[in-house]
């Protein structure tokens, strides 16, 4: 099980990175709203 986790961890990290890059404009908008509300 641990070996499987070691194998899939980089794959999951890569997918998360791709999703992060795709949603970057949405994240920037979220950060703008969040920082605006944080004041």
From Swiss-Prot:
UniProt GO BP: photosynthesis
Membrane topology listed for this record: Single-pass membrane protein
Pfam assignment, any one: PsbY
Cited InterPro entries: PSII_PsbY
Superkingdom of origin: Bacteria
UniProt entry keywords in alphabetical sequence: Membrane, Photosynthesis, Photosystem II, Thylakoid, Transmembrane, Transmembrane helix
Statement: the UniProt record of this protein carries the keyword Membrane: yes
Chain ranges passing through the membrane: 4-22
Gene Ontology molecular function, alphabetical: manganese ion binding
Family that this chain belongs to: Belongs to the PsbY family.
Its job: Loosely associated component of the core of photosystem II (PSII), it is not always seen in crystals. PSII is a light-driven water plastoquinone oxidoreductase, using light energy to abstract electrons from H(2)O, generating a proton gradient subsequently used for ATP formation.
HAMAP family: PSII_PsbY
Subunit organization: PSII is composed of 1 copy each of membrane proteins PsbA, PsbB, PsbC, PsbD, PsbE, PsbF, PsbH, PsbI, PsbJ, PsbK, PsbL, PsbM, PsbT, PsbX, PsbY, Psb30/Ycf12, peripheral proteins PsbO, CyanoQ (PsbQ), PsbU, PsbV and a large number of cofactors. It forms dimeric complexes.
Protein name as annotated: Photosystem II reaction center protein Y
Organism expressing this protein natively: Prochlorococcus marinus (strain MIT 9515)
Gene, per the UniProt record: psbY
């Amino acid at each position: 099980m641990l070996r499987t986790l070691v194998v899939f961890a980089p794959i999951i990290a890569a997918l998360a990175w791709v999703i992060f890059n795709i949603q970057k404009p949405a994240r920037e908008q979220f950060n703008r709203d969040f920082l605006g509300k944080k004041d």
